[in-house]
């Protein structure tokens, strides 16, 4: 279930300030953020945002298809190492 239209999308204030400053300066350097819950807006297209996954910052390049999704969707928090092979073998 999505967020109410009258409320608008959530974006962290610090992230919004950094984006507006970079857009004004025509700067495209990497922005570090811990805000995985922030919604991707059209003004973010073309930026690289380093999203924290609990251990490190994962660089995410924002494209047009990502608009409306959350930043945390593109920085996985768990690593899948595969299923363990059957130890019994061929008895």
Swiss-Prot record:
Q: Which GO terms describe its molecular function?
A: rRNA binding; structural constituent of ribosome
Keywords attached to this Swiss-Prot or TrEMBL record, sorted alphabetically, are:
Ribonucleoprotein, Ribosomal protein, RNA-binding, rRNA-binding
Q: Which GO terms describe its biological process?
A: ribosomal small subunit assembly; translation
Q: Extract the InterPro entries matched here.
A: Ribosomal_uS19, Ribosomal_uS19_bac-type, Ribosomal_uS19_CS, Ribosomal_uS19_SF
Q: Which family does it belong to?
A: Belongs to the universal ribosomal protein uS19 family.
Q: Fetch the NCBIfam families from UniProt.
A: rpsS_bact (TIGR01050)
| Protein name per its UniProtKB record | Small ribosomal subunit protein uS19
